[in-house]
Amino acid sequence: MSAVVSLDIGSSALAAVEINHSRDRVSLANAAIEALPEGLVVDGEVTQPEALAVHIQQLWRKAGLKGKRVRLGVANQRVFVRNVEMASIEDAEHRAAAVQFEAAEHIPIPPDSAIVDYQVTETFEDPSSGLRDRVVMVAAHREMVDALVSAVRRAGLTPESIDLEAFALLRSLLPPVPMIDAGSMDQPAQAICHVGASMTNVVIAVNRQCQFTRLFGFGGRQLTQAVVERTSMPVEEAEQVKRAIGLVGGIPNGWDENNTNAIRHALALGARPLVQEIGRSLDYYRSQAFARPIERVILSGGTSLCAGLDQYLAQALGAPVELANPVMQLDDANIDPQIAAHSAVAVGLALDGGDL
């Protein structure tokens, strides 16, 4: 049995998950979060590696995390994801070379400044050109990855792998595909909306294979700020009422109807851009020739703790919305709901490692 530690570095918090792998089970050994001050990570990019390293060390010490090798995820505006079609190539080395060539055509990063990875999502027969692959291509600015790695190494840890956060979300929030259905793209699509403090990641998959991913700059901080601007509450209090009162529900104990309605009105106004951008993402996916009907939307991320956000999105989007269960595939997964809400990426990283 070997311990694996995965670390999700967000704009407002660190989330670490340590799991145990044995022959027939995967169990949760430890999970913890550590709040971050503003400015260390901005829109998913590490801007102050030295200061961030101190908080990583604090998280390891407070939580009693034992592993020194970590798996990391990336998601920011300097990571580019493209869906391309190319001739199917069986040899892995030749395929990788072909992907590098395609990256030069599709990714707006100079080749010597980019780290490129890919995932084949479907192989199909084209009547005119034979076997072809649908490929999700990922490219990241090398200096952005270097800043992330630097912070982790300064904390005395060793990066084991770096993966796209979208892929990690698919592993933690969607059930494994039965062997009989592996490779089939005839199933309905599942959408994940991972709403963090400052960024939202929309991922759409069929049979756990990524077909679409989009990142945009909106998160829980904007909802909190909407309450601050319309009620003059301090930020800390606005953050609390955002979670406790939320967008939908009855009148909480200790609150009157007028104040509750004022807060919900502020949150509804603040949430409009979130609804619009998620809706645009879903509509764009639906417009693609390969799109499948979207069966449900799974809501994850720290902002999912905002009471009633799932119901609000379901009504606004006209689609079923479910709250995520990031630890559904782990045995003995007794975890605080506050920690669980922040752990979807970290759990997915722990379930498998990337190689960006």
Residue ranges of model-derived segments:
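Non-catalytic, solvent-exposed interaction/assembly segments
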Residues: M1-E102, H106, D146, G156-T158
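Glycine-rich phosphate-binding loop plus the immediately following alpha-helix
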Residues: V41-G44, V145-R171, Q209-I251
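Phosphate/pyrophosphate-binding loops at sites that engage ATP/ADP/AMP, CoA/4′-phosphopantetheine
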Residues: I56-R69, A155, M233, G279-E295
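Active-site neighborhood for divalent-cation/phosphate handling
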Residues: V74-I180, R296, P326-D332, V345
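Glycine-rich phosphate-binding/hydrolytic loop that grips phosphoryl groups
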Residues: A168-R171, S304, E322-L356
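Adenine-nucleotide phosphate-binding core of ATP-dependent small-molecule kinases
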Residues: E229, A238-I294
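Glycine-rich phosphate-binding loops at beta-strand->alpha-helix junctions
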Residues: G270, R292-E322
